[in-house]
């Protein structure tokens, strides 16, 4: 007749719980406030990546208008750009500037030193490509109009020098206006650049202000051309899509839209060889050839010319576009060219054969992955040669924002989490589910000391952070699309190490597809792990010493592998997989058993701390496993025993407490279902030393929707009743522990006494995302420490409710400090210390605290308003290696070596203003003035192929030494002249005065035969 008001409901709750001890211990609202502790992952999808070798920093730009810069361990600095621009290009300059170009052709200059945005420059025309050098202030900007602007990053101004569209003005005036397609600085001479337009490629000299050489690729009728050539009966001019220098700068490569790869001689402009990925001499006419334009072939979209530590040993890495044809998976091709023949003694025919017959070719398939849109080589030897100097890691960027890591040249893919910072682990590959859990502090810290923590990035210095005082640590577990599960320390602001445990179910299941992780359960006291794949296989792991560590496969191993090739061949539900653990892991999470029930997708999984594992399937089956056997002790469909018509189990909780009026405690397994029904089971010892499961009751507890979570606590003390080994051992004493159980439904929370009654009920206006109990230590006015048990509820609208128990009375309503995503917020977790891990997006989660630690008295130094300290990115002690120079042959031909100082004069003029930023003065000390200075600051071994800078002498005393060096080279056999003279090239360059320089050059020419 009358609707029950909220006030009457609160009174009813208070009356019901009046006789029960308030385990929240009178906690009040002043103890609570929200603060974001840290963020895991990235906001948005990655669109661009770039790497700085000297500072060892990696930067990624996302669709959310953010640029993340990563260093060693957990170092991360985020630049948030106004208006969320989409970044197209990004480069590091001098290690201290980060340049970004957005889709509207704005140039954004960021300081790695001050971590500030220095300026934004608007470009009057659309930017099609850019080029920078790690050691120079200048940025070359290719425009849609075909012109090239030169931007002085350090002075924040454009150079007066503007390079015209040479295709239109000089070579092909009748062709339509071509944009600049590609720009590359000469790897040995900053005075020249390689420019490509749609139909022609030129070498331009800053010193002479003119084109020094041009390259025009034209196919005669019936020449096959590349894989995508059409109209072969006509003369064609395939458009250029990219051009590259050979690391020695003596040859170039032009890449064309028909997949032609054309090698040219820089000095003469002569075509050396034209090929495609698989075919050679594709520029030679063949009248018998038929038009193959209907043959579907993936188009090349990017090529990198990689070199080993000795830059004369090179290879090509070629990426092709994805097609819709499933029979043509996207691939990356490696063409290993091997050592480059000596230019001075190799004919054009011999050089053509060199490019036609590489040492080897490999195809790296990307089958099953999203389309590849870009790749980034990560060099180990120097920042030069286009960032391709001695790389064994290639970072692949996929269309969906995922990152893959290609081991080069082996061709295998590595998703090893510790290689890069934890935030990038969310996209290597995509996280499919995540949970967070509280772990005993000493146990956790001991376990994490042996976790993998090696990192490719070495840059940056972590900021000093305040350590929060908690008796527990927080573990973050992420499941990924490739079947891997990673276990991290969630306390990002307190732990700077990159330590992570990683397990991979692909090897355990012996499968390459359908591996995505859907459910994870972690027993934090017994260090056991249970995970389920998307097709319903459940894999059990335990933290232990690996008995197969370091073992090589035995002679009968092949037969064993064949017999276990597929789990589908197994006739039993439980499959022993203890021999499928990694042999290179001495101690860690080792697989033990797979539950291969063939029941379809898993709806719920719980690995208890007392050795029992419960697995619920969408089709209704509930399996309970005792890991001590292992043995299945229960296997039934809950649809048979449900009283309310439940279809499947949605969540499981194991606890030790009194059931009804038993007078003693029991192991209870509480199962929530899809319609809000609570099903109670007892786990009892059986006569044969095993355990048995007894169904006791089923009660409809929540209004609507599935049950999201179940928790329990003792009525008298407020401590958790979750099942542990110590509580299980105490059962023999017959002690009764009266307890409450909290059940979270779609939009309500019910508190019940198992086997007795439904007690308090709380209803919320918005649906519940997640909820849980937290156990908060409080120092009262007398200085006494007491425990306050509270219920924290996160709603999907961003409200955070703090409730007392058992009354479920609201103490405070807080607003979540991070935006929520309805699609991912259910992957959030409430932790025992008052923290909440909230998944905010596909690639991101945040750790927040609702506890005001200074008010609780547990940490007087805590300041909830204090901002998170920012890491240091730039290290001024690191020197940029000296740039490689032209070799002896180019010097002998008359190539004038251009110094950075001379280039500054050529591009900036003699009236170039003073530096605008302090970054310039800081970076100036990090540019090596000689190779010896560079060698002192760079990793050992990198000086083997370093090029000494010539130093001009004020006197003539060094002239005799130079001539003596030349004469020794002349006496050496001709085939070693080019090799040995490189050692003298820099000695001869600028150490001679004008007269001695001319004399030495004449002698060199006669020695080589010019």
Curated annotation (Swiss-Prot):
It holds the Pfam family Lgl_C. The keyword DNA repair does not apply. It comes from the Eukaryota. Keywords: Exocytosis, Repeat, WD repeat. GO terms for molecular function: GTPase activator activity; myosin II binding; syntaxin binding. One of its GO terms (biological process) is exocytosis. One of its GO terms (cellular component) is plasma membrane. InterPro entries: Lgl_C_dom, WD40/YVTN_repeat-like_dom_sf, WD40_repeat_dom_sf, WD40_rpt. WD repeats lie at residues 47-80, 87-122, 127-163, 182-215, 240-275, 299-364, 372-407, 431-504, 518-595, 602-637, 649-700, 709-763, 768-815, 829-852. Acts as an allosteric regulator of polarized exocytosis by promoting the targeted fusion of vesicles with the plasma membrane. Involved in maintenance of ion homeostasis in cells exposed to NaCl stress. May be involved in the targeting of the myosin proteins to their intrinsic pathways. Multicopy suppressor of RHO3. May also participate in the maintenance of cell polarity and bud growth. PANTHER family: LETHAL 2 GIANT LARVAE PROTEIN (PTHR10241), TOMOSYN, ISOFORM C (PTHR10241:SF25). Belongs to the WD repeat L(2)GL family. This is Lethal(2) giant larvae protein homolog SRO77. The gene is SRO77.
């Amino acid at each position: 007749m009358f609707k029950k008001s909220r006030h009457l409901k609160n009174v009813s709750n208070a009356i019901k719980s009046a006789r029960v001890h308030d385990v929240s211990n009178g906690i009040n609202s002043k103890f609570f406030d929200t603060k974001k502790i840290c963020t895991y992952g990235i906001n948005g999808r990655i669109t661009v990546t770039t790497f700085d070798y000297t500072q060892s920093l990696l930067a990624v730009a996302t669709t959310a208008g953010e640029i993340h810069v990563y260093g060693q361990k957990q170092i991360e600095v985020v630049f948030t750009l106004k208006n969320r621009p989409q970044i197209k290009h990004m480069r590091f300059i001098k290690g201290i500037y980060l340049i970004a170009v957005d889709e509207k052709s704005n140039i954004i200059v960021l300081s790695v030193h001050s971590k500030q945005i220095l300026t934004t420059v608007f470009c009057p025309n659309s930017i099609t490509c850019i080029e920078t050098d790690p050691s120079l202030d200048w940025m070359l900007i290719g425009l849609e109009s075909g012109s090239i602007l030169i931007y002085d990053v350090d002075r924040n101004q454009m150079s007066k020098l503007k390079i015209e569209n040479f295709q239109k003005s000089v070579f092909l005036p009748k062709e339509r206006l071509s944009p600049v397609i590609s720009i590359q600085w000469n790897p040995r001479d900053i005075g020249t650049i390689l420019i490509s337009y749609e139909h022609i490629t030129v070498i331009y000299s800053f010193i002479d202000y003119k084109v020094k050489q041009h390259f025009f690729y034209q196919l005669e009728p019936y020449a096959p051309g590349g894989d995508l050539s059409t109209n072969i009966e006509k003369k064609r001019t395939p458009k250029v899509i990219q051009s590259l220098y050979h690391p020695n700068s003596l040859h170039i490569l032009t890449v064309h839209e028909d997949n032609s790869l054309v090698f040219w001689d820089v000095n003469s402009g002569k075509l050396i060889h034209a090929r495609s990925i698989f075919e050679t001499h594709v520029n030679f006419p063949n009248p018998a050839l038929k038009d193959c334009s209907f043959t579907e072939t993936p188009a090349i979209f990017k090529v990198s010319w990689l070199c080993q530590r000795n830059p004369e040993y090179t290879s090509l890495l070629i990426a092709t576009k994805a097609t819709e044809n499933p029979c043509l998976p996207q691939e990356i091709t490696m063409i290993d060219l091997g050592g480059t023949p000596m230019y001075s003694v190799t004919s054009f025919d011999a050089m053509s054969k060199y490019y036609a017959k590489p040492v080897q070719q490999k195809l790296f398939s990307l089958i099953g992955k999203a389309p590849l849109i870009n790749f980034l080589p990560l060099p180990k030897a120097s920042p030069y040669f286009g960032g391709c100097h001695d790389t064994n890691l290639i970072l692949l960027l996929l269309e969906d924002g995922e990152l893959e890591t290609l081991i080069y040249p082996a061709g295998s893919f590595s998703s090893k989490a510790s290689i890069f910072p934890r935030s990038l682990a969310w996209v290597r590959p995509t996280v499919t589910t995540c949970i967070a859990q509280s772990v005993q502090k000493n146990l956790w810290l001991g376990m994490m000391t042996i976790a993998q923590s090696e990192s490719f990035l070495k840059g940056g210095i972590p900021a000093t952070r305040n350590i929060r005082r908690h008796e527990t640590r927080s573990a973050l577990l992420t499941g990924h699309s490739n079947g891997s599960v990673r276990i991290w320390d969630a306390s990002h602001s307190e732990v700077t190490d990159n330590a992570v445990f990683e397990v991979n179910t692909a090897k355990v299941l012996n499968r390459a597809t359908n591996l995505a992780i859907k459910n994870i359960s972690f027993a934090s006291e017994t260090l056991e792990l249970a995970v389920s794949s998307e097709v319903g296989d459940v894999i059990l792991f335990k933290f232990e010493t690996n008995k197969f560590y370091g073992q090589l496969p035995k002679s009968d191993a092949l037969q064993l592998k064949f017999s276990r090739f597929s789990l589908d061949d197994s006739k039993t539900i439980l499959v022993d997989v203890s021999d499928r653990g990694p042999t290179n892991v001495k101690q860690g999470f080792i697989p033990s058993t797979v539950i291969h029930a063939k029941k379809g997708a898993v709806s719920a999984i719980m690995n208890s701390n007392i050795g029992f594992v419960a697995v619920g399937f969408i089709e209704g089956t509930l399996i309970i496993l005792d890991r001590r056997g292992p043995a299945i002790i229960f296997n039934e469909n809950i649809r048979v025993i449900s009283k309310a018509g439940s279809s499947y189990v949605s969540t499981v909780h194991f606890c030790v407490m009194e059931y009804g009026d038993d007078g003693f405690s029991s192991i209870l397994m509480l199962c929530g279902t899809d319609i809000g029904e609570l099903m109670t089971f007892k786990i009892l010892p059986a006569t044969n030393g095993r355990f048995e499961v007894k169904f006791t009751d089923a009660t409809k507890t929540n209004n609507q929707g599935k049950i999201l979570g179940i928790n329990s606590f003792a009525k008298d003390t407020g401590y958790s009743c979750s099942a542990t080994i110590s509580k299980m051992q105490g059962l023999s004493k017959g002690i009764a522990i009266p307890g409450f159980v909290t059940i979270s439904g779609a939009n309500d929370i019910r508190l019940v006494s198992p086997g007795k009654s439904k007690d308090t009920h709380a209803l919320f206006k918005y649906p519940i995302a997640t909820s849980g109990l937290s156990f908060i230590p409080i120092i009262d006015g007398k200085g006494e420490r007491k425990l306050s048990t509270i219920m924290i509820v996160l709603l999907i609208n961003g409200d955070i409710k703090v409730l007392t128990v058992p009354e479920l009375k609201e103490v405070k309503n807080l607003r979540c400090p991070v935006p929520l995503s309805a699609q991912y917020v259910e992957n959030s977790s409430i932790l025992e210390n008052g923290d909440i891990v909230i998944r905010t997006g596909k690639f991101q989660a945040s750790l927040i605290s609702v506890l005001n630690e200074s008010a609780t008295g547990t940490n007087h130094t805590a300041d909830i308003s204090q901002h998170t300290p920012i890491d240091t990115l730039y290290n001024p002690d690191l020197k940029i290696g000296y740039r490689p120079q032209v070799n002896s042959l180019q010097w002998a031909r008359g190539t004038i070596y251009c110094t950075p100082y001379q280039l500054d004069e050529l591009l900036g003029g003699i009236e170039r203003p003073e530096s605008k930023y302090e970054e310039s003065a800081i970076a100036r000390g990090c540019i090596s003035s000689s190779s010896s200075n560079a060698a002192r600051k760079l990793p050992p071994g990198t000086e083997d192929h370093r090029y000494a800078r010539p130093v001009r002498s004020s006197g003539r005393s060094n002239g005799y030494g130079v001539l003596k060096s030349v004469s020794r080279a002349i006496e050496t056999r001709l085939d070693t002249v080019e090799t040995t003279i490189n050692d003298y090239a820099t000695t001869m360059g600028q150490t001679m005065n004008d007269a001695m320089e001319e004399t030495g050059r004449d002698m060199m020419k006669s020695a080589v035969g010019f």
